[in-house]
Amino acid sequence: LDNAIQVNTDACAEGFPAMSILPSDEILAQFGVRLITALGGRLNPHWLVESQREKWVLRRWYQSAESIDYELRLVARLAALGWPVAPVVEGPVELAGHYWSLAPFLPGDPPSAAAPHAEQRARGRLLAQFHADLSRIEGFGQREGWRRCEAVLTDPALDQTLTMHEQTRSEEVRILRWHLERARRRIVGLKLQARPGMIIHGDFTPWNLRFTSGRLVGVLDFELAHWDHRVGDFALSWRGKYDEVIHGYAEVSPLEPEEWELITPLWWANLIENACRDMRNGTCDDGWTIKKLLQRSVLMGQDAVGFG
């Protein structure tokens, strides 16, 4: 056990960082803060801390230094454009093999879930406005560990992984292969490599937004931000079911016909790549990926047909 964290319970079986870890006294002293409570985070754990009666967020990064720098530069650019984000004020500093940083605490609450369709449509409109500024940001290539769906779907390693696990996970592999083949057929003729790209947020979900009295006061969690097709931001904001997000987006920024065609295979490529990575790493997701692959929406067009 390194001296930067104290572990209260075992890490989860799926291979993600344990959420019960606490920053050590050494870490708290480094930033001159007092621990208040854990804030969560699937990959990058966060804690609410206090210094001189001000609240801050302490973060332990799981990414490489290169990926961290990518995110820090992006958030700083967005702050300069007037978006309510939380640029790092101290760090990152490396202690015992981990990077740590301190950022402002953004108050507010996630959008109300009382009227889900209205929330989704409003979030779609907000995403289009966010993209208008994201598209102005230049000087960013691809983030380490990411690639666009055309590279994913043409990767023979996917087929090799599925073949390797066909005997032990036959039904899961059958579902993955069926969707992989349909996604590949769907992108034929779209000339994706020639299409423009932009930086996307990657997880524009209600829990990553904060509002006060109906006013946006926080956009959180850029750990999945990367360079992609702009409709790549529909993957985790739409998830194959929240159609109003896409309709709201299109109200502000209409989609091209090719982009409508791309939404489904891009979403499936994301799921299939993650599933194959889990297979290679021997981790599991309790069936979440397969459940999402089997989700259907009228926006899928020809791919709204059921698996079979």
Regions found by a protein language model. Give the residues of each.
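Active-site Asp-x-Gly
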Residues: 199, 210-260
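Conserved catalytic-loop position in the HRD/HxD motif
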Residues: 203
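A cross-family kinase active-site recognition segment
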Residues: 114-174, 197
